[in-house]
């Protein structure tokens, strides 16, 4: 039953407005001869999948209304009596039925990104005992760490096209289950030999590569513009909390059960998420039969038109300077971010002389700071937009913080000898970096909402190239140079990105 509500009344004329066929029996004709009843009876039935709200309203002669409402789930019925208004909207649904569906989608995307980084950073910790067991040198470690990005690079644009044409639900679901299987297979591949491990890590990148374009496609359809920064900040904070969770639990699991346990336990969580995703999510509000009319109207009034994409206007997209600003700044941003993501535990272990457990636990703080800062930045950005600041200025302010903050704090690492201050500097660097979620990471939906998946695929391809080159280059730099050289390159790219972003970016829609 697709109708949201069914209205029945003892007034025969109202039957013709309730989607019921006219009654032609003799019993119905006899109803017209009945004297008006002093009480009017109305019934609303609200079907919600396997549950319903059933309410009977009775109006007395003094025009007050009493009611008895029932919540039905399976064979269980519960009810209550009260006095209500003359509107179906006064029906009180259980809290889990009233929770905005768009935020259910956001939370599911958040949890997917939580798993994404849990499965990605576990290698950053496990690589330490694995290197000792298999005798890998820093160059080999850099090769293993960068192999993830080989597959990740392949599916950025393809994932965006796929999401924009067939819907983000299928694409994100595919990505999560694919990378979860690859995670589980990692210990087996490592035992078989280095080539097998490189292939499995690349396969894992294939799955994670479609996640960001698919998520961007889904949220561009579900989230109103005034909630865009907050929703994206929450989803991306899932990545940071995934790093926190992975870095915190990996040392414990390795210590108790050995390094393979990290991959088996983290990878198995993907099946739990997939079950919830398939039952609760839809690619678009138009495909969701359980969406309440009020929320459907809110989304329709405040989201860009999302007609099905049949072809991608590549020439138009690539002719726009703000698109190239987005692509180049994504490269500048991700160089430093991915180096810290993959090499931070090694930095703590080699430079700051922390043991395995300490390296994992202390690596948590920068990512925890990012999770907090990303959500704070999202709230600040949406507040500024609601108070009349242009989207362009808000995006430039937030991304400038996201570039200059990390540049400043990474520069300070050269002058710090205290391990405590080094960890604090790293946390501040990552915390200011998180303001980028309300800058360049929100900009795809600003400038090309219909093609946001493809556009994110384009810019993130540049970001992944930065990850591949930066992660592999760091291994070679450390064989012949120092960590100061690694950080200097990152700072230089942050400064270049700041200039490009403030000269060429915009928050206005430039592609319909």
Curated annotation (Swiss-Prot):
Gene Ontology cellular component terms for the protein in this record: chloroplast thylakoid membrane; thylakoid
Pfam families to which the protein is assigned, alphabetical: MFS_1
Transmembrane segments: 103-123, 141-161, 171-191, 192-212, 234-254, 257-277, 323-343, 361-381, 401-421, 453-473, 486-506
pH-dependence of activity, as noted: Optimum pH is 7.5.
Sections of the chain in a coiled coil: none
Subcellular location: Plastid, Chloroplast thylakoid membrane
UniProt KW Transmembrane keyword: yes
Gene Ontology BP, a term: sodium ion transport
Its biological purpose: Specific for inorganic phosphate transport across the thylakoid membrane in a sodium dependent manner. Binds glutamate but cannot transport it. May act as an ascorbate transporter at the thylakoid membrane.
Protein name per its UniProtKB record: Sodium-dependent phosphate transport protein 1, chloroplastic
């Amino acid at each position: 039953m697709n109708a949201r509500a069914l209205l029945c009344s003892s007034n025969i004329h109202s039957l013709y407005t309730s989607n019921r066929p006219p009654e032609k029996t003799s019993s119905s004709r006899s109803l017209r001869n009945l004297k008006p009843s002093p009480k009017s009876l109305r019934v609303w039935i609200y079907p919600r999948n396997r549950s319903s709200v059933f309410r009977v309203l009775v109006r007395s002669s003094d025009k007050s209304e009493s009611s008895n409402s029932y919540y039905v789930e399976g064979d269980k019925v519960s009810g209550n009596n009260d006095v209500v208004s003359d509107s179906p909207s006064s029906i009180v649904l259980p809290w889990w039925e009233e929770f905005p569906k768009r935020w259910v989608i956001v939370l599911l995307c958040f949890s997917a990104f939580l798993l994404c980084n849990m499965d990605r950073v576990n290698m950053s910790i496990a690589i330490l005992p694995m290197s000792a067991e298999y005798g890998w040198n820093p160059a080999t470690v850099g090769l293993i760490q960068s192999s993830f990005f080989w597959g990740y690079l392949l599916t950025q644009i393809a994932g965006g096209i796929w999401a924009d044409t067939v819907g983000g639900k299928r694409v994100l679901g595919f990505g999560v289950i694919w990378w979860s299987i690859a995670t589980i297979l990692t210990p087996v591949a490592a035992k078989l030999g280095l080539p097998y491990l490189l292939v499995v890590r690349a396969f894992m990148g294939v799955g994670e590569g479609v996640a960001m374009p698919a998520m961007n496609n889904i949220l561009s359809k579900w989230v109103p513009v005034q909630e865009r920064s907050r929703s994206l900040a929450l989803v991306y904070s899932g990545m940071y909390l995934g790093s926190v969770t992975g870095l915190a639990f990996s040392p414990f699991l390795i210590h108790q059960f050995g390094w393979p346990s990290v991959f088996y336990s983290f990878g198995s969580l993907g099946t739990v998420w997939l079950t919830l995703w398939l039952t609760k999510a839809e690619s678009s509000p138009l495909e969701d039969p359980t969406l309440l009319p009020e929320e459907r109207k809110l989304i329709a009034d405040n989201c860009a038109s999302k007609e099905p994409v049949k072809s991608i206007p590549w020439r138009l997209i690539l002719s726009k300077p703000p698109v190239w600003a987005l692509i180049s700044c994504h490269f500048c941003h991700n160089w430093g971010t991915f180096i810290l993501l993959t090499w931070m535990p090694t930095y703590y272990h080699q430079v700051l002389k922390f043991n395995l457990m300490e390296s994992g636990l202390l690596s948590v703080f920068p990512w925890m700071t990012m999770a907090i800062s990303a959500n704070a930045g999202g709230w600040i950005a949406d507040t500024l937009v609601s108070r009349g600041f242009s989207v362009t200025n808000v995006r430039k302010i937030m991304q400038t913080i996201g570039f200059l903050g990390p540049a400043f704090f990474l520069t300070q690492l050269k002058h710090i000898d205290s391990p405590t201050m080094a960890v604090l500097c790293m946390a501040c660097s990552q915390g200011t970096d998180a303001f980028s979620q309300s800058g360049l990471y929100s900009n795809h939906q600003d400038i090309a909402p219909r093609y946001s998946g493809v556009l994110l695929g384009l810019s993130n391809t540049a970001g992944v190239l930065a990850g591949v080159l930066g992660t592999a280059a760091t291994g070679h730099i450390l064989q012949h140079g120092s960590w100061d050289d690694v950080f200097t390159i990152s700072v230089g790219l942050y400064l270049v990105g700041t200039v490009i972003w403030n000269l060429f970016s915009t928050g206005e829609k430039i592609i319909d």
